[in-house]
Amino acid sequence: MLGDRDFRTTIKSSIEAVGKELDYAIDLEDSGKIHASEVTRCLRRSFYDRLDGLEPERSRFSDLLGGMFRKLEYGAKSAQYSLDNLKLEGQADMIVDDIVMIFKSVQVFPDDPFAKDLLYMNACMWIYDKIDGVIIYIDDKGKETSFSVTRDKKMFEETVRRVRTFEALLKEKKTPLVEPSIECSTCQYYERCFTQKKESKTLNLMTVSYTHLTLPTIYSV
């Protein structure tokens, strides 16, 4: 009977399966090739993904929005930017009339682009050698808002610095510092960062210092 079947589990499994298919293709074994998505978010999360990964929880099909565009015929193809002995890899969702585009799902529209989205877009513009980009946010009701951005050299230099830092930490197998953000509460590695098992003490996010963060100042666009 229908009532005896666990549809929530079936739906969750379906979303997770589709999510794996639509995720960025990252070679986790090659520390000489770094994906832009790894260094425009918390480095510790990317570090754990590489060396001791856990599957993230995907709960909404809307979270898969960007990957769906990339899989279409007119979706953007992955590209690389050479950094001497390193390769910075990235993939926009679409490129239309030389304009780089990425799509993100949100529940509430931001007043400005989220820092990690702006950093990722900027990296993509340098990787594809394009000047202009658009970040499009779409909510659960299908409404959208967008931000036009122009590539920025200083911001890209910060991304390159993070690439080199991440590559060095991977080689040394040295865990990066915590970079607190609103995403921590839903991160699959939350307990590794904010729970000290030996002392059975839980750290409060609000008491963690933000002084070590290295993301550049994000300006309105």
Give each language-model segment a name.
Residues 1-100, 105-115, 122:
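Metal-dependent nuclease catalytic cores that hydrolyze phosphodiester bonds in DNA/RNA
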Residues 42, 184-187, 193:
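Short cysteine clusters
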Residues 48, 190-193, 199:
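Secreted/processed peptides and extracellular or luminal domains of membrane proteins
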Residues 54, 196-205:
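Short cysteine/histidine-rich zinc-coordinating motifs and their immediately flanking basic loops
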Residues 81-171, 191:
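Nucleic-acid nuclease catalytic cores
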Residues 166-184:
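Immediate flanking context of iron-sulfur cluster ligation sites
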Residues 211-217:
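Conserved small/polar residues in nucleotide/adenosyl-binding loops
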